[in-house]
Structures are given as C-alpha cells and as structure tokens.
A protein has these predicted regions:
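C-terminal output helix
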Residues: 120-129
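Conserved acidic carboxylate
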Residues: 24, 48
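Charged docking surfaces used in two-component/phosphorelay signaling
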Residues: 31-39
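Active-site beta3 strand of CheY-like receiver
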Residues: 60-66, 71
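Disordered, acidic interdomain junction associated with two-component signaling
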Residues: 1-19
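The feature encodes the CheY-like receiver
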Residues: 72, 100
Length: 135
C-alpha cells in the first residue's frame, strides 16, 4: 500500500461543475496552481491583473476566486471590492507573499473570505478550497 498515493488521492477533489478564477501574474505561481487544480476537473479561468479579473468575473459564472493581492494595473484589494460589489456572496481567497502583521485583516476588510500565505502548501490550498466549494 503506497501511502504517498493515498495522501495524493485524498487531496484530489472532483469539482467538474465548478469554475475557479485564478488571478495571478507570476508564472511560477501559475504553474503551481495549474498543477494543483488540474486533477480537480474544475474549469480554471486565468487573469493576470485585477482589471482583467473584474472583467472576467462579469463575463463568466464563477464559483470561487483565488486572488493575488500584488498585481499590475489594478491591485487585488481593489479587484476584490469591485467583484464583491457585483456579487457579495462569491468566495474570494486572498493569496499573497506579504505575511506582515495586519495583512490578514486588510484582506478581510477588502472583502476576502479567507487568506493563504505564500508559499502555499497543497494540503492547505485543497482544504481551503474544499471549505467553500463543497458546501
């Protein structure tokens, strides 16, 4: 019995009917999210900045947003506020490398529903997504 495969299988969710908008401008982070989310069967939409995220949100039915906060053109805080103005019930999970004191509170004030500090561990990502997508 291969324990590593069992753990990996436990992490894999089946979200074939779900749409996740990933807002990320750093290629290495995009690769992580792509690899992590591919096996969930969720449809993944990509935005490279906050303005593109707001536009994509308006044009698509989205179940959850993974929002980087430090973005070009429009930051993640502003994009979060604009998306929440459109749909207050959409879960938005902040993901940021800024882990200074007060950062979580700043995210929540902007309207984020949860917060992930980079580097993000796969188990924590899946647990957090499950909390919102398995309702």
């Amino acid at each position: 019995m291969n324990t590593a495969n069992n753990v990996t299988s436990a992490l894999i969710q089946d979200w074939e009917s779900k749409v996740i908008l990933v807002v990320e401008d750093v290629d290495t982070n995009k690769i992580f999210f792509d690899a992590a989310l591919r096996k969930t069967k969720a449809k993944i939409l990509w935005a490279k900045d906050g303005l593109e995220a707001v536009n994509m949100f308006q044009e698509n039915i989205v179940d959850l947003v993974l929002m980087d906060l430090q973005l070009p053109i429009m930051d993640g805080y502003t994009a979060t506020r604009q998306i929440k103005a459109i749909n207050p019930s959409i879960p938005i999970i902040a993901q940021t490398a800024h882990v200074m004191s007060g950062e979580r509170e700043k995210c929540m004030e902007a309207g984020c529903d949860d917060y992930l500090a980079k580097p993000i561990r796969l188990q924590i990502l899946m647990d957090t997504l499950s909390k919102f997508l398995n309702k």
